[in-house]
Regions:
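Single conserved hydrophobic/aromatic residue that forms the stacking wall/gate
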Residues: 1-11
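Nucleotide-sugar donor phosphate/pyrophosphate-binding loop at the beta->alpha transition
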Residues: 18-21, 69-90, 132
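A short, active-site helix/loop in glycosyltransferases that binds the activated sugar's phosphate group
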Residues: 48, 85-86, 90-121
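Glycosyltransferase donor-sugar binding loop
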Residues: 130, 150, 177-191
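A conserved mid-protein helix/loop that constitutes part of the nucleotide-sugar donor-binding site
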Residues: 145, 149-168, 190
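Nucleotide-activated donor-binding/catalytic signature segment of Leloir-type glycosyltransferases, i.e.
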Residues: 190-210
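Aromatic "clamp/platform" in nucleotide-sugar-dependent glycosyltransferases that forms part
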Residues: 228
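Short hydrophobic beta-strand element within catalytic cores of glycosyltransferases
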Residues: 245-249
Length: 331
């Protein structure tokens, strides 16, 4: 029951469900051709249908923060179409622009919509985050052999692959060490901790939990991303912004965006249908890439410098200009 103040005054203490409430609310906006509505990861939210039905001549922008399609093993809850976006795709003729994070995702989404006989609106590639203006190069001395990962602790993030790779790499180079930032469900976290414990790796692999990493990244030499996929990867962007060398699996989309082979790190060949079932061989390749990065100090310093250069493409003014261009181009 709505209280008799604010919007409650409009509805005179009527008992209505949330869909009807949102429909009435959207109607009161009186949307017109000068209005732009941005739906930010709203696939499950109840205002989508009322907004579509009452948009008038306003413009709709739909922002995708996750992938639209998953192969087997790639996601714990979805297979093939990502049903978070089902309604958007079914009624895509009502949308003026889809916004995704990368050009690779843009091409993939366009092909997907055509394959499923969906209307293809304009699609723009605009990163979902930015590196602050005036961010300076770190003057910190980076810890020798240090690796950082920053993500949820979930199977899709491949932390088990990373841990096993570091264990193998440490057998060759005893300076290599890993700090794991992030949290997850207790069962999976315990599984990861047991891998470390059983290998006797507690002294060089540490679980750091969740924290603000803004002042932490610059202490590390290498950022590792062994996710099975990354729609964008804000932590990857933050890492290149602080000049870290990069290593990860050759998967869509974020790893390929921020890891430039032989420029700021290495991408490791990966095929989910074969490698996911044979992680031991995969870990041999990923461990070799980690060892290689630390073999040559001069090359590692060059990787750091190149990451800073790559980060320039993601400064705030660059991202702002992309949004301004999109708004200017809305038909």
């Amino acid at each position: 029951r709505l209280r008799s103040r604010g919007l409650g005054d409009v509805y005179k203490r009527q008992v209505i469900d949330n869909v009807e409430f949102l429909e009435r609310f959207v109607k009161t906006l009186n949307l017109c051709e000068n209005d732009i509505c941005i739906m930010d990861r709203a696939g499950y939210l109840d205002y989508i249908q009322p907004l579509f039905e009452n948009k008038g001549k306003s413009k709709l922008i739909a922002v995708l923060h996750s992938d639209h399609f998953y192969k087997i093993y790639e996601d714990e809850s979805s297979l093939y179409m990502n049903y978070e976006y089902y309604y958007w795709f079914k009624y895509s003729e009502a949308i003026d622009y889809f916004v995704v994070g990368t050009d690779e995702h843009k091409r993939s989404l366009e092909a997907f919509l055509k394959e499923y006989d969906c209307f293809v609106p304009h699609i723009a590639a605009i990163p979902p985050g930015a590196i602050p203006e005036g961010k300076l190069k770190s003057k910190n001395n980076r810890w020798q052999g240090s690796i950082i990962s920053a993500s949820r602790l979930s199977p899709r993030k491949g932390i088990d692959i990373l841990i096993k790779s570091v264990i193998k790499a440490h057998e060759i180079n005893q300076t290599i060490n890993l700090d794991i930032y992030g949290s997850g469900n207790d069962e999976y976290t315990s599984y990861l901790q047991n891998i470390v414990k059983d290998a006797g790796a507690d002294d060089y692999i540490h679980f750091k939990g969740r924290c603000n990493l803004e002042k932490i990244y610059p202490h590390y030499e290498l950022f590792a991303s062994f996710s099975l996929w990354e729609t964008f990867g804000l932590s990857l962007m933050e890492a290149v912004g602080d000049g870290l060398a990069m290593v990860g699996l050759d998967v869509r989309y974020g790893n390929r965006l921020f890891i430039h082979p032989d420029e700021n790190g290495y991408l490791v060949d990966f095929d989910i249908e074969t490698d996911y079932q044979n992680k031991d061989k995969l870990c041999e390749r990923t461990a070799a890439a980690i060892v290689k990065i630390f073999e040559d100090d001069d090359r590692l310093k060059k990787f750091h410098e190149n990451s800073y250069m790559i980060a320039e493409e993601y400064k705030e003014h660059v991202i702002e200009s992309k949004w301004m261009q999109l708004i200017k181009n809305i038909p």
